[in-house]
Amino acid sequence: MHNQAPIQRRKSTRIYVGNVPIGDGAPIAVQSMTNTRTTDVEATVNQIKALERVGADIVRVSVPTMDAAEAFKLIKQQVNVPLVADIHFDYRIALKVAEYGVDCLRINPGNIGNEERIRMVVDCARDKNIPIRIGVNAGSLEKDLQEKYGEPTPQALLESAMRHVDHLDRLNFDQFKVSVKASDVFLAVESYRLLAKQIDQPLHLGITEAGGARSGAVKSAIGLGLLLSEGIGDTLRVSLAADPVEEIKVGFDILKSLRIRSRGINFIACPTCSRQEFDVIGTVNALEQRLEDIITSMDVSIIGCVVNGPGEALVSTLGVTGGNKKSGLYEDGVRKDRLDNNDMIDQLEARIRAKASQLDEARRIDVQQVEK
């Protein structure tokens, strides 16, 4: 029931990764990267499909060898989500996966080879209408830039990025996006701010090597949140030392928190105190797991008492306010029913699913009327 965020997004050019539009006002795409051995086709396909199920718009796959390139061909045939091939050092691998229908090439022109090899990759990408992502990382800056700046700085990352951008410009290739990642939040944020002023191409956001599930999510929320709130960013990845599925969930949670893009349920829940009339924490944890399949955008407030419960329920799609033995259920801000506190999880799940179906049907009818 909340309005969209009052964020003015940076204007950028439009590219396509497969069928996913990037930039020029398109929805911010959420992506992750597989962490299986790419040569293990079955495991990689299963992981990609798991990422698809939680809403991944794009998935990146590392392709370090020719054997991995051959595996990529088989993987590509079995999934629907657009795939980005992560290529380093060997330009021939980029040419090979281009033959196999890759949707985007992630390369670092600084380590892909000499001028002629870069030109071959770019010409191939142009011929097959494949976009490129230039990936600059604070941990792998060119040696001369390390010597010039002494350490990774925003100016160093910007210079590295512009060096590669200029390279593609000289080859008359403009179908690319750029990232300037660092594990330090402020280094990454300032680097993206500088880059956003220099180019019109889409920007892929990320705090690289952010950390484990908890610390990495916090770092990413701060860094990406700062940039997104300033209108910077067209795609994003939350890099976690965890199951890649968690990266997608956190990515959407960041976008939901900023009211930029919603997918699924936005749970609003109190941290609990002695006033709670039912098990709020257990209810929220159970419902988050049970309702992962719901992609309908809706706010659900679960508050354990009447102090803040009614107020939150007024601005939620569905809201529960804790009461003695039974708790009040609100729908679109209006009190509708009372739920038994001892059977809260099952009752609330049923109500949420019913509301999601109702909203989906209403949107389907709206679309049909517009199409007429």
Swiss-Prot record:
Annotated pathway: Isoprenoid biosynthesis; isopentenyl diphosphate biosynthesis via DXP pathway; isopentenyl diphosphate from 1-deoxy-D-xylulose 5-phosphate: step 5/6
Enzyme class: oxidoreductase
Cofactor section: [4Fe-4S] cluster
Pfam family, one: GcpE
Superkingdom as given in the UniProt entry: Bacteria
Listed HAMAP family: IspG
Any one GO MF annotation of this record: 4-hydroxy-3-methylbut-2-en-1-yl diphosphate synthase activity (ferredoxin)
Keyword Manganese set for record: no
Note accompanying the cofactor annotation: Binds 1 [4Fe-4S] cluster.
Signal peptide positions (record): none
Lineage: Bacteria, Pseudomonadati, Pseudomonadota, Gammaproteobacteria, Enterobacterales
Family: Belongs to the IspG family.
Function (record text): Converts 2C-methyl-D-erythritol 2,4-cyclodiphosphate (ME-2,4cPP) into 1-hydroxy-2-methyl-2-(E)-butenyl 4-diphosphate.
Binding-site list for [4Fe-4S] cluster: C270, C273, C305, E312
UniProt GO BP: isopentenyl diphosphate biosynthetic process, methylerythritol 4-phosphate pathway; terpenoid biosynthetic process
E.C. designation(s): 1.17.7.3
Keywords, in A-Z order: 4Fe-4S, Iron, Iron-sulfur, Isoprene biosynthesis, Metal-binding, Oxidoreductase
Name of protein: 4-hydroxy-3-methylbut-2-en-1-yl diphosphate synthase (flavodoxin)
Catalytic activity: (2E)-4-hydroxy-3-methylbut-2-enyl diphosphate + oxidized [flavodoxin] + H2O + 2 H(+) = 2-C-methyl-D-erythritol 2,4-cyclic diphosphate + reduced [flavodoxin]
